[in-house]
């Protein structure tokens, strides 16, 4: 190791190490199973989704049923497809998902979260785009609990002055 005698030597040494660290950075690697699929889990409200993606024609199966059958409302299908649209990867991956818990809206959000994470495992270069759009962040909002002495979580019982 070389001797550092002045502040300039120290700055030069630090700049040299940071530049070499960037050059020697290990590129992100795909995380695939033995079938060539990327697996990820997604959560939203009380719903938990397990998602597998593999290269294909854009087929989506949820709990063994087609996307149009499981999510009849177009809004829920749109929520589910958002990560693919943002990443410009529509019709390029076959998606298989199993989802339990919650309602349809929470399930659609959980699958969206799972698809986003699986896409980053398949194509690590998409991480920046998906993170910027907020698809990789777990939406932590859940239903507020009911409190005793109240009708609901915040709603009080009707008050009578007399």
Curated annotation (Swiss-Prot):
UniProt keyword Ribosomal protein present: yes
Keyword match Coiled coil: no
Coiled coil stretches, renumbered: none
PROSITE patterns: RIBOSOMAL_S9
GO biological process: translation
Gene Ontology CC: cytosolic small ribosomal subunit
Entry keyword set: Ribonucleoprotein, Ribosomal protein
Molecular function per GO: RNA binding; structural constituent of ribosome
Top-rank taxon: Bacteria
One Pfam match: Ribosomal_S9
HAMAP family: Ribosomal_uS9_B
Family to which the UniProt record says this protein belongs: Belongs to the universal ribosomal protein uS9 family.
Official protein name in the record: Small ribosomal subunit protein uS9
Organism of origin: Parvibaculum lavamentivorans (strain DS-1 / DSM 13023 / NCIMB 13966)
